[in-house]
Swiss-Prot record:
GO cellular component: Z disc
Predominant subcellular localization, coarse grouping: cytoplasm
Upper taxonomic lineage: Eukaryota, Metazoa, Chordata, Craniata, Vertebrata
Name of protein: Telethonin
Gene name, Swiss-Prot/TrEMBL: TCAP
InterPro entries the UniProt entry points to: Telethonin, Titin-like_dom_sf
Biased composition (Polar residues): 156-166
Pfam families recorded: Telethonin
Species assigned in the record: Bos taurus (Bovine)
Biological process terms in GO annotation: cardiac muscle contraction; cardiac muscle tissue morphogenesis; cardiac myofibril assembly; detection of muscle stretch; sarcomerogenesis; skeletal muscle contraction; skeletal muscle myosin thick filament assembly; skeletal muscle thin filament assembly
Length: 166
């Protein structure tokens, strides 16, 4: 099934008002597909020959950013469809559970109130905070890594090759 696509890119910039608009969409898709109800199949059992032919049609789909889609078979006319409005995100990012006045809202749970009070008392500081120098004193000393080429071999080259061969 062969498919050809045509994309559109529109960009506009207004430097005075510091505005920009940019849109890109797949505008036209032309695909070749088998045509329904248009196939021929012949079979000759004496000569052991078969012949099969499938009709093909070119399906055309045109989309636009204005939520209009046209589709149909090339040469037979296109049917136009108005697509329903769809949000960019599938769900709103934030929806309050209950919106109302302060009196109607439920009180904050006690555990959450205590946690919030503790965070405000600490002011974002860790009680057990240590300086980096104190932490590095507790670590073992750093040993420089030797270069791989300077390692001494315990076996000669011929011995190590024999060990690899088994």
């Amino acid at each position: 099934m062969a498919t050809s696509e045509l994309s559109c890119l529109v960009s506009e910039e207004n430097c005075e008002r510091r505005e920009a608009f940019w849109a890109e969409w797949k505008d036209l898709t032309l695909s070749t597909r088998p045509e329904e109800g248009c196939s021929l199949h012949e079979e000759d059992t004496q000569r052991h020959e078969t012949y099969h032919r499938q009709g093909q049609c070119q399906a055309l789909v045109q989309r636009s950013p204005w939520l209009v889609m046209r589709m149909g078979i090339l040469g037979r006319g296109l049917q136009e469809y108005q697509l329903p409005y769809q949000r960019v995100l599938p769900l709103p990012i934030f929806t309050p559970a209950k919106v109302g006045t302060k009196e109607e809202r439920e009180e904050t749970p006690i555990q959450l109130q205590e946690l919030l009070a503790l965070e405000t008392a600490l002011g974002g500081q860790c009680v057990d905070r240590q300086d980096v120098a104190e932490i590095t004193k507790q670590l073992p000393p750093v040993v420089p890594v030797s270069k791989p080429g300077t390692l001494r071999r315990s076996l000669s080259r011929s011995m190590s090759q024999e060990a690899q061969r088994g």
